[in-house]
Design a protein with these regions (language model features):
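A long amphipathic alpha-helix within ATP-dependent nucleotide-binding catalytic cores
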Residues: 151-212
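Active-site nucleotide/adenylate-binding loops and adjacent lid/helix of ATP-dependent enzymes
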Residues: 5-173
């Protein structure tokens, strides 16, 4: 928590939220089914979405869309989120990893593109950033695991401890998809994303794009 003040006015904040945000608005943002419904009613183009069901139903949804996103209905900071899942086994494993955050798990069709974070205050866009997944740069000597640890320390130092790259199942899945593991040595000068998601808390990088 922190406080912004100007003159005699003070507003309490948590990350990008303020005490001006209503409880109803928080609910609409926190529950991703309600978020989807609200944006759909506003006429926006959205990914297909459904609750995870039986393994057969989940596999059929995957076959229909080719690649999926799995996420808990209620959550934040990218916890329990996995993207670009292409096999039934990966989908089911991601569902199990999401359940500790919420028993209700969503499946969505996956679409490539920019990951944007936009801050709106008083119906005015005041900040915008492209979020990029955590990445490492090979030096031909250190293993990918060592490079991740080093980059994670740099991200923690730059963000006051908020950002680090977890060496978890999602990071390992990303490495395996590229043909690597933690013990592999990345060629010198080769840059590689080690996460599919771009959340700040999992090592993601923010690039200001308000003036683009």
């Amino acid at each position: 928590l922190f406080t912004l003040s100007q003159g005699g006015r003070r507003i309490r904040c948590r990350e990008s939220l303020t005490d001006l945000t209503s409880a109803v608005t928080m609910t609409l943002c926190q529950d991703k089914r309600l978020t989807h419904r609200t944006l759909s009613r506003a006429g926006l183009s959205l990914p297909a979405q459904r609750l995870a069901g039986s393994a057969e139903d989940n596999a059929a949804f995957l076959a229909e869309h080719g690649s999926l996103v799995v996420k808990p209905v209620d959550g934040e900071q990218g916890q329990g989120v996995a993207v670009d899942l292409r096999t039934p086994a990966d989908v089911q494993a991601a569902i199990e990893r999401a359940r500790p955050f919420d028993e209700r798990v969503l499946l969505e069709s996956y679409h490539e593109g920019f990951d944007l974070r936009i801050v709106v205050i008083g119906f005015e866009v005041v900040a915008a950033a492209i979020r990029r997944p955590a990445e490492i740069l090979g030096d031909g000597r250190h293993t990918i695991g060592e490079l991740i640890d080093a980059q994670s320390r740099r991200r923690q130092a730059a963000t006051g401890g908020e950002s680090r790259i977890p060496k978890d199942a999602e990071t390992l899945r990303t490495l395996h998809a590229a043909g690597y593991d933690y013990d592999s040595v990345l060629p010198q000068g080769k840059r590689m994303a080690v996460r599919k998601t771009a959340n700040l808390h999992t090592g993601g990088i923010l690039e200001d794009c308000l003036l683009y």
